[in-house]
């Protein structure tokens, strides 16, 4: 395998990882920010108040977008495995 091919595969794998992780990370970030602003405004310093909404949000996003995420991941894996014979030559 050539160096360019390996770098390209690594780059595409990182892009896929970012694409699949971004919805969960972004939604939990927004919920955490909103809860933190609420806690600062009301002076409530309960740790579980910030943790539980983020976990619920992450599960909800995975539940709603899980099919799309799996489809993207399977398509990527199928493409990788289908091209292995071409890359070996």
UniProtKB/Swiss-Prot annotation:
GO CC annotations, alphabetized: bacterial-type flagellum basal body; plasma membrane
Keyword Transmembrane set for record: yes
GO BP annotations, alphabetical order: bacterial-type flagellum assembly; protein secretion
Transmembrane segments: 18-38, 49-69
Matching InterPro entries: Bac_export_3, FliQ
Localisation per UniProt entry: Cell membrane; Bacterial flagellum basal body
Topology relative to the membrane: Multi-pass membrane protein
Keyword set, alphabetical order: Bacterial flagellum, Cell membrane, Membrane, Transmembrane, Transmembrane helix
Chief location: membrane
UniProt function note: Role in flagellar biosynthesis.
Similarity-based family: Belongs to the FliQ/MopD/SpaQ family.
Name of the protein: Flagellar biosynthetic protein FliQ
Highest classification ranks of the organism: Bacteria, Pseudomonadati, Aquificota, Aquificia, Aquificales
């Amino acid at each position: 395998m050539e160096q360019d091919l390996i770098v390209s595969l690594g780059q595409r794998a990182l892009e896929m990882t970012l694409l699949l992780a971004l919805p969960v990370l972004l939604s939990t970030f927004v919920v955490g920010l909103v809860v933190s602003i609420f806690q600062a405004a009301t002076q409530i310093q309960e740790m579980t108040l910030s943790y539980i909404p983020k976990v619920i949000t992450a599960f909800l996003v995975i539940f709603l977008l899980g099919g799309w995420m799996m489809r993207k991941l399977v398509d990527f894996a199928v493409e990788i495995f289908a091209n292995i014979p071409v890359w070996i030559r």
